[in-house]
Amino acid sequence: MKMANPKYKRILIKLSGEALAGERGVGIDIQTVQTIAKEIQEVHSLGIEIALVIGGGNLWRGEPAAEAGMDRVQADYTGMLGTVMNALVMADSLQQVGVDTRVQTAIAMQQVAEPYVRGRALRHLEKGRIVIFGAGIGSPYFSTDTTAALRAAEIEADAILMAKNGVDGVYNADPKKDKTAVKFEELTHRDVINKGLRIMDSTASTLSMDNDIDLVVFNMNQPGNIKRVVFGENIGTTVSNNIEEKE
């Protein structure tokens, strides 16, 4: 089948840490990472410029640790290191399927990754390399969703692809608990904020809205879905400033 022109030419894919854990839900499952890497490689081979942000929830969660008595700042820094571990594993899997990949971190660790430098990240993308951003934004209290929105704005990405485990979009209620839940095909960023739809945290949603970055929430467990989103197929939920607000 002949493919149309891509809707998005430069994307930032946001993966949860749990996406790397496979069925176990914790830790890192190498076969799962390799499967995701092949999906990304297929899209990259079509000339799409790709950056990644990966959460760290498969290895560590700062908020529960803080609630249990750990200093919140230290707990968040620990989580940032978890995102770097995930980034290094994903980078290795992408390298193994033939994709030149760089990891850039917001906390200096020169032995394993480049420091985050916007201009260098842009050059990597222009040269056909994938860039994975690790260690959040380098400061506590900010989520990896906010990292994704910030880095997407900085690299002038056309869209953030929120790749979800077994969730095929945004609903007005939890579809696992409410059989009458209705999926939204389209939303504005303001819809998301006003309705309290927790796709991303409010900081990330506002950043995406202010910088006019589309957000697509889709099920990553269906093979080929990343490509479908990039080429504009109507899957998942698209959040954009260029959509009429829902009542």
UniProtKB/Swiss-Prot annotation:
* EC id: 2.7.4.22
Q: Where is this region: Involved in allosteric activation by GTP?
A: 22-27
The pathway that the record names for this protein is: Pyrimidine metabolism; CTP biosynthesis via de novo pathway; UDP from UMP (UMPK route): step 1/1
According to its UniProt record, which reaction does this protein catalyse?
UMP + ATP = UDP + ADP
What is the name of this protein?
Uridylate kinase
- Which organism's genome codes for this protein? Streptococcus pneumoniae serotype 4 (strain ATCC BAA-334 / TIGR4)
The job of this chain, per UniProt, is described as: Catalyzes the reversible phosphorylation of UMP to UDP, with ATP as the most efficient phosphate donor.
Which positions does UniProt annotate for UMP binding? 56, 76, 137-144
Q: How does it assemble?
A: Homohexamer.
- Note the Pfam families from the entry: AA_kinase
From which lineage does this chain's organism come? Answer: Bacteria, Bacillati, Bacillota, Bacilli, Lactobacillales
Query: Which cellular compartments is it found in?
Result: Cytoplasm
